[in-house]
Amino acid sequence: MKKQFNRMRQLANQTVGRAEKTEVLSEDLLQVEKRLELVKQVSHSTHKKLTACLQGQQGAEADKRSKKLPLTTLAQCLMEGSAILGDDTLLGKMLKLCGETEDKLAQELIHFELQVERDVIEPLFLLAEVEIPNIQKQRKHLAKLVLDMDSSRTRWQQTSKSSGLSSSLQPAGAKADALREEMEEAANRVEICRDQLSADMYSFVAKEIDYANYFQTLIEVQAEYHRKSLTLLQAVLPQIKAQQEAWVEKPSFGKPLEEHLTISGREIAFPIEACVTMLLECGMQEEGLFRVAPSASKLKKLKAALDCCVVDVQEYSADPHAIAGALKSYLRELPEPLMTFELYDEWIQASNVQEQDKKLQALWNACEKLPKANHNNIRYLIKFLSKLSEYQDVNKMTPSNMAIVLGPNLLWPQAEGNITEMMTTVSLQIVGIIEPIIQHADWFFPGEIEFNITGNYGSPVHVNHNANYSSMPSPDMDPADRRQPEQARRPLSVATDNMMLEFYKKDGLRKIQSMGVRVMDTNWVARRGSSAGRKVSCAPPSMQPPAPPAELAAPLPSPLPEQPLDSPAAPALSPSGLGLQPGPERTSTTKSKELSPGSAQKGSPGSSQGTACAGTQPGAQPGAQPGASPSPSQPPADQSPHTLRKVSKKLAPIPPKVPFGQPGAMADQSAGQPSPVSLSPTPPSTPSPYGLSYPQGYSLASGQLSPAAAPPLASPSVFTSTLSKSRPTPKPRQRPTLPPPQPPTVNLSASSPQSTEAPMLDGMSPGESMSTDLVHFDIPSIHIELGSTLRLSPLEHMRRHSVTDKRDSEEESESTAL
């Protein structure tokens, strides 16, 4: 206690008073002392952070560390996931490989942490918590010894001063000697402690390189750990890539064309082939294809399905615009356009050539420079667009329109420039490139092409979705077959469809049209489209325009073999009504069901007006060339143009009336007028079989059979012809077994008017005949086989009446159920 008191008093004197303070350390050792504290702080914080970096439990064994290591837990999870998904899936294989790799990495991590803990963390702990504190402890002990020495010196000095003034020298001298001995002993202890402290400090300074080696060891151990980990990863990466490359199902949108074709082993990109094949089945007659925007949700869904190589054809056959939008989106999302950046300048230069032949040659040269993959796909696409342009009368997509909407998706500049420039100049140039290629597709890419190369993407359902309603079912169809097209049509309003069916059967066409419902029926349009040909055929031979050479040389072939007719033109009825002129046996008009739509269209006009001229020319003979007209025999029902004009609905202004003896003038006036019906597409569904009965008061021209004189009709289904499902008009090609029709002659006795009509209608498509029609006869014709009617027994009449009544009741009950 006395020593402690002396130390405190000496410290107070040195701090407050002016007592002398002895400094036993040199300047260098004082600097080392300051550095000790800094090194201690750094070592302590580094040790703390390094310990936090350890993922395993510090100080535990390797097995215990492995169980609690996050990488080990991850590896176990991946292996369990692989077992759940199975090795037959790509994801299962990936999980298994990654799980094994993560387990190996976990083992390397454990080894790394053990080495870091042994070579870095523990030495830093000893430095910060043992070595430096020991030096600092000696420094504190030296400070105490110095205070003891200073206190002894101060007391000795005070004793010496007081002994000089005192009279009794002996007691004072003895006390001074004792204090001097104490002072010398304290000085010796200070000297020993100072030497030991100095040695430790100099040793610390000398060992600083060893302390630095701790951190070098840390980096080396980390490098070795990462090197081993990298070796493991590099060993497993080829296996993972091999598994992925072996897996064929990969996204195609936004991927390079070459990569997609190489992975899938295809020549035509899957989205292109799938979309084209589906459009060939359900979209060729869709108005505004590629121009009408599809539903965004359906487009997104279809793109995702195409990426997975899984397409629900039945679902998307109901929306051709979504299919066309997906095709445009795929072409636009290609990293490089289908016509390539490399040939962009050459395409643009070719489009700037003014002369048509040189322009086509320049485009052909650029097309031949395309890479093989791009050339195959552009050939496939252009062939499809060329085929689509064959239906331009219905779908309104001319080569120019297709070039406008598809051109920017086939070619665009590599450097995105001014948007205004791209929308004007560049867009027009690209249209000038694509349009002639579509127009001359067979010249650019000769030969036929098979669109459905790898699989059946097409839909068995043919639906035109621009029409609000499907056509009425045929009464000859089975009820089960009749429901199938009804289920596939657009579900607008069941009530409206039912009402339309009832009005159709009861009140006829005019009542339906008076309600504002647009009825799309290919049967009526076929008869309307043939009216122009009927008018021309009824005109005098001197007023008939010559047929085009191409149409005369190559009449349209029917898809089905034509049945030979005993007589191509039926003789006109005598004024007596039931008396028949002698001639070959007549053929039933019900055979028109078995003919193609083209032949049915050519055979039906005679029912309403085709024999009008025959009635005014009694000298006409039924003998004609068998190949001149593929249509069945004309029904013997002549009607006046004036009478038909009264009954039909006037969709356009009627031209000034001319005398009855000048039907050619009416044909000339109506030739330049477009038909309003041609503005709307013709649905490809089954035409309506229901015919409209003539009113009782229907007046006929003189010399013709009146309705009252005709025998009663047994059933509409017996005497009404039903057209088969309309098919696209095939390209004109020469028939090898049929000679070309002869041009009409002036001599009326040599051939009948029907023989003049046949070559005119053979080369005309329904769209061409419709475009020149002004007055439309909306009343369906009724073909009556008089010979077979007269031969019907009463039993057959009763049977047919019962069948008709049964079918009518089935249709009424079905419409009520709807």
UniProtKB/Swiss-Prot annotation:
Residues 563-579, 614-641, 688-708 have a biased composition (Low complexity). Highly expressed in brain. Expressed at weak level in other tissues. The record marks 291 as: Arginine finger. SMART domains: BAR, RhoGAP. GTPase-activating protein (GAP) that stimulates the GTPase activity of Rho-type GTPases. Thereby, controls Rho-type GTPases cycling between their active GTP-bound and inactive GDP-bound states. Acts as a GAP at least for CDC42 and RAC1. In neurons, is involved in dendritic spine formation and synaptic plasticity in a specific RAC1-GAP activity. Limits the initiation of exploratory dendritic filopodia. Recruited to actin-patches that seed filopodia, binds specifically to plasma membrane sections that are deformed inward by acto-myosin mediated contractile forces. Rho-GAP domain is required to promote GRIA1 exocytosis from recycling endosomes. Rho-GAP and BAR domains are necessary for the control of long-term potentiation in hippocampal neurons. In dendrites, BAR domain mediates the recruitment to patches where plasma membrane is deformed by acto-myosin mediated contractile forces. Residues 14-249 form the BAR domain. It comes from Homo sapiens. Keywords: Cell projection, Endosome, Exocytosis, GTPase activation, Phosphoprotein, Synapse. PROSITE patterns: BAR, RHOGAP. Gene3D superfamilies: Arfaptin homology (AH) domain/BAR domain, Rho GTPase activation protein. Residues 598-611, 746-757 have a biased composition (Polar residues). Interacts with BST2 (via cytoplasmic domain). Interacts (probably via PDZ-binding motif) with SHANK3 (via PDZ domain); the interaction takes place in dendritic spines and promotes GRIA1 exocytosis. The keyword Phosphoprotein applies. The keyword Phosphoprotein applies. This is Rho GTPase-activating protein 44. It holds the Pfam family BAR. The modification Phosphoserine is found at residues 493, 809. A motif (PDZ-binding) lies at residues 815-818. Its main location: other. Residues 479-489, 794-809 have a biased composition (Basic and acidic residues).
